Amino acid sequence: MLIRMISSISRWDGSRSVNRKDAFICGDAISDLRTTNNELRVWKADTQEDIEDAIVALALNRDSVSKLSYFLLEEDELKKIEIDVSDQKPGAAAGLKDCILSKHRDLIELDFWRLGFLTQYMLELVKNPKQCKNLTRKEIKALLEKYKNKNLITVEQMNSKLKEDLKW
């Protein structure tokens, strides 16, 4: 499995309406699939520990602790829609141990069609509460504290705004 952060599940679940009789998905959801160099960042997430590792990495790339939403993507399903996964670039999250950063992946060689197929796939996933989740600020903060206490985060290397928000 792979984990992909999104801005909000409400963009995907149909609760945000578009005043068109032919509306398919709210346009804001597409911004969750913004690529760089035709790639989309994801994290390896085969276990609950992997999921937590990814969430911590994503949280460490922010200026403050805030809610976080994500989808869990099945690699076999991505293969069916001809989306390839690369492990060539390590992840980046200031202060996080390399053993976690090595779980970073990229969906690569994305084009208009692959993004469309990925959108359709994610619209199916949103119907399954096991495949998508919203985490509260409190849950994110508790996870960051847990990783700090396990010495998996080097506080001195963290983003100063995030450290200030956490009062570390």
Indicate residue ranges for each PLM-predicted region.
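ADP-ribose/NAD+-binding catalytic cleft of ART/PARP-like enzymes
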Residues: M1-R41, I55, L166-W168
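Conserved NAD+-utilizing ADP-ribose enzyme module
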Residues: D32-N38, D46-W168
